Amino acid sequence: MTKKSFFSLGRLLLAVPAGAIATLTFAPYNYWLLAPVSIALLLWLLQAQTVKRSGLIGFLWGLGLFGTGISWVHVSIDTFGGMPKIASVFLMSSLISYLALYPAAFGALFNRFNRGRPFHQLMLSGPVIWLLLDWVRGWALTGFPWLWMGYGQIDSPLASLAPILGVEGITLALVLISGALVASVVYRNWKPLMVPVLIMALTWAANTVSWVVPDPTKNLDVALIQGNVPQELKWLPSERWPTLMKYTDLTRENWDADIIVWPEAAIPALEAHLPTFLQNLDSAARNNNSTVITGVLDQKEDGQYFNNILTLGKNAYGPYQYDKATRYSKHHLLPFGEFVPFGDLLRPIAPLFNLPMSSFSRGDLVQPNLEASGYSIAPALCYEVAFSEQVRKNVNIDTDLLLTLSNDAWFGTSIGPFQHMEIAQMRALELGKPLIRSTNTGITAVVDHTGQIIKQIPQFETAVLRATITPTEGLTPYTTLGSWPLYFYSLWSLTLSMILIRRRSGRFRDTRPVETE
């Protein structure tokens, strides 16, 4: 093996661990400084490479990131999917490989344009290409915006950008910082370091601004019920009433709370099958001047299934009646859990796809806030909280707090529930609203408007979290503008990059020969 071949192979081998260390930036590890390290390593590995080899380097980096970062998905597929081991491994490998195509596309596009002009690559077109591909990943095939790099910065100084530009703005800042580091070190030019200096100055300035104002006059007491019902028992007919009685007993002990919250699909039956139980619960809550919010599945007369949130007791809707109840219906459904992409092709393959309720119908993208005990609540069911634009569109000037219900029992003791919690924290920070999160097995927690967890209870315990919530007044810039500032920045950056290409200009050029295959 020649020296050149050795170093070429070394780039490929280094790409996998370079991507894998990025997983450590996310919860539960929270080593947020590793994010710019991982991105900078990728950008360095892409220097002076052909388009084809750049795509391969990006793909291997993506295998490292997603192979470690979403390993928790396999827990659900393998434990509850009813698949042969080889089938579950194949499905998981396919998902990881699909997600790795996005870093592969980044690598290829990175060296497709502006080759020989590293400043353009690292500071203009590169960060925007990364951002655009993140948006595509969050949309294609219903979207999978998990492990956007900005999420791992919830505890870093860059977090102060979230109320202005959202998690995508934090990701952009990370790629710009990483690009500046590579440009300054590899090409021995200190001027790009002005970019991270300016970004950190912006984060400091943003941190001094109070975008929203807490309103203690609207404080409310909440009780979040964590039932800790084993997933393998949850839907057994013999466990229906024991589960309902568990939640009812825990609720009865907390009637002094303004709002009592049960997890996603806490009621292990279809709503239409339990009218008497729900009427009695509604009456008890109303008599105690409290509201119960619960997740419940429903099937309409036309056969459509919905994953809903229902409010009972003290609300603006009156006594519970099945035909007149106001519900929130989940819009963003979980692939393979709540609907099967390419169902006609995949359903015969494995029992996982033959679950009777694996084909849910969508609710509307924007729905009225839920009303509970006089408070206006913007809900998101489970996976939906990862879709920042959807959650943002459901927040308005009257919204008091955010609510997310989930059942992360599917993912056992993996890192998945921690990443899910971190995403919920980012939504609270972006929108400047406190957030309550009730789950079956954890993580059940309360988050303030700055994205910090103020109280939580341990996973895998039957428990009740009691906390006082302080709603906020006002709207953050991100709530008002969404991603439009980033759209305009992307357009400006790409336009400027093309203008500079046409002028054949640049602050400095990479005169090194491109490494051949």
Curated annotation (Swiss-Prot):
This is Apolipoprotein N-acyltransferase. It comes from Photobacterium profundum (strain SS9). SUPFAM superfamilies: Carbon-nitrogen hydrolase. Keywords: Acyltransferase, Cell inner membrane, Cell membrane, Membrane, Transferase, Transmembrane, Transmembrane helix. The keyword Transmembrane helix applies. InterPro entries: Apolipo_AcylTrfase, C-N_Hydrolase, C-N_Hydrolase_sf, LNT_N. HAMAP family: Lnt. Its EC number is 2.3.1.269. It is a multi-pass membrane protein. Catalyzes the phospholipid dependent N-acylation of the N-terminal cysteine of apolipoprotein, the last step in lipoprotein maturation. The keyword Transport does not apply. PANTHER family: APOLIPOPROTEIN N-ACYLTRANSFERASE (PTHR38686:SF1). GO terms for molecular function: N-acyltransferase activity. The gene is lnt. PROSITE patterns: CN_HYDROLASE.
